Amino acid sequence: MASLGVILFFVIASLIHGKPIHSERKAAKIPLEGSNLGYKKPNNIYGSRLSQGMRYPPSMMQLYQTLILGNDTDLSILEYPVLQESDAVLSLIAKSCVVVGNRWTLSFDMSSISSSNELKLAELRIRLPSFERSQDVTVEIYHTKEGQENLFMGSFKTNPSVAMGSSWKIFNLTRMLQYYLHQGEPFTNVEYIEVKNMHERAKPHVIKRGVRAEVEEGLQRNKDNTPASSFPTERVVLVVFTRDKPTASHFGSPSLIHTVESSKYVMSENTVRVTDTRRPRRNQKTKNTIVMNTIPSRSVGKTLCRRVDMIVDFEKIEWGDRIVYPKRFNAYRCEGACPIPLNETFKPTNHAYIKSLVKLYDQEKVECSSCVPVKMSPLSMLLYEDGEVVLKHHEDMIVDECGCN
C-alpha cells in the first residue's frame, strides 16, 4: 500500500488545479424527495454510463490523496475524527446561487444523501470574491430535484467577510441537515453561524439568535424589489461525510455491493466473506506446538498455501467509467494446498487444526482445509455514484495474510 500511495501521489498531483474546495446519521422520518433510500437496480445492466469528461471537485482528489498517503496533518481539526468514523464523503456542487440584497438562496440536489446512513458532518463551502463588502446576510438552503418542487431545508445568518484571509469560507450545516433527517421538516431556528477560513478549518460554533415563527416562502422572495444577481455554482459546494449503518447481512458492509451491482459482473450467491479469525492465546500454546511438531505433515505434492499477486484493472472489468482512482491495484489472493496436519505457520483456528488431525487418521471423514485470507485490509476509492463523486472506504479489499481454515 505504501508504494501504491507514492505512485498515486504523483499521478494525482499532476491533475489537481486550483485551490481545494473543501457527518452521526439516523433514519429519517420523512426523507428528502428523490433521496436514495435503498439501491435500485438500473434497467440497463451496465447502469448509466458516465462521461469520461465528467467534472469532479479538486478537493475530493486532495482528500483521496491525503487518505492514501496517511498524511493526517493535511486534515482539519474537525475533519480528522470525522474521517475516522466515516466511510463515504460526498461533494455536491450547487445547482443555483441567487443573491437578492442581503439574502442568498442556494440550491443543491441532495438525493444522494441517503437516510439509511449516519450523517457525520455537513459543511457548506463558498468561495467569495475578494472585493465582497462586509455585511450580515441570510443564507437559505434548498433541496432541488429536476421535475419536483424545491424543498426548503432551513436558513441561517452570517457575515462571510468577518473571517479575513482565504476567499474560501466554511459553514457547518450538520445540525440543519440532521434536523431535517430526524424531524422531516425545515430547520426554523434562525441561527448565526460563524464563518471560518479554509486554511483555519477549525471547528465552527453556532450561536443561537432566536426562533422564527414562519418559514420563508419561495426561492426568490424579494419584498423590496432589489435586483437579483448570481455567482458561479462551482464556487458553492456542500461536502457531506457519512457512514453506512451496520446490517444483518453476512456479507458485511453493503457499500461495495451497491457499487458493483450495476456492473457487468454480479457477485455470486456462493460468495462467502472470510473474517479475520484469531486464535486465542493460552498457556497450552507450548504443548500445542510440541504436538504439532511431533506429527509430521504429509506431503501434498503441491505448493503450500501462500499469498500471490492479483492485479485488478477496473478498465478491463468495465468499471473504468465509474472508478476515478485507483484505476488498478493489487488485491492479492490465496492459493496452494494445506498440509496435514496444520501447524502455526498457516494460522489455523482451533477447529481447523482439530479437523486436520481427524483428516490425518481418517481420510474419508472430512475434507481438506482451504487456503483462504485470514487478514485483510481496506481500500479507499474515489468513484462516481448517482452522478456525484464520492470517496468511499471499503473494508476487506486487500489480502494481507493467507492461512488454512
Swiss-Prot record:
InterPro entries reported for this sequence: Cystine-knot_cytokine, TGF-b_C, TGF-b_propeptide, TGF-beta-rel, TGFb_CS
Result of altering C368S: No effect on mesoderm-inducing activities
Tissue-by-tissue expression: First localized to the vegetal region of the blastula. Just prior to gastrulation (stage 10), this expression disappears and instead becomes localized to the dorsal marginal zone, with enrichment in the organizer.
Residues with attached carbohydrate: N71, N172, N343
Record text about domains: The pro-region is necessary but not sufficient for wnt-inhibitory activity. The central region is required for muscle induction activity.
Summary of subunit composition and partner proteins: Homodimer; disulfide-linked. Forms heterodimers with the TGF-beta family member derriere. Interacts with tsku; enhances nodal2 activity.
The organism of origin for this protein: Xenopus laevis
GO annotation terms (biological process): axial mesoderm formation; determination of left/right symmetry; dorsal/ventral axis specification; gastrulation with mouth forming second; mesoderm formation; regulation of Wnt signaling pathway
Name of this protein: Nodal homolog 2-A
Disulfide pattern: C305-C371, C334-C402, C338-C404
Superkingdom classification of source: Eukaryota
Keyword Disulfide bond included in the entry's annotation: yes
Stored CDD domains: TGF_beta_NODAL (cd13759)
Function: Cooperation and regulatory loops of multiple nodals are essential for mesendoderm patterning in early embryos. Essential for mesoderm formation and axial patterning during embryonic development. Activates the activin-like signaling pathway to induce dorsal and ventral mesoderm in animal cap ectoderm. In addition, also dorsalizes ventral marginal zone (VMZ) tissues during gastrulation. Induces muscle actin. Appears to act as both a short-range and long-range morphogen. The unprocessed protein inhibits bmp- and wnt-signaling.
Annotated gene: nodal2-a
Main location: secreted
Propeptide residues according to the Swiss-Prot or TrEMBL record: 19-282
Keyword Nuclease: no
Position of the signal peptide: 1-18
GO molecular function: cytokine activity; growth factor activity; growth factor binding; morphogen activity
Family that this chain belongs to: Belongs to the TGF-beta family.
Induction notes from the record: By dorsal mesoderm-inducing signals including activin and other nodal-related proteins.
Keywords: Cleavage on pair of basic residues, Developmental protein, Disulfide bond, Glycoprotein, Growth factor, Secreted, Signal
Gene Ontology CC terms: extracellular space
Subcellular localization: Secreted
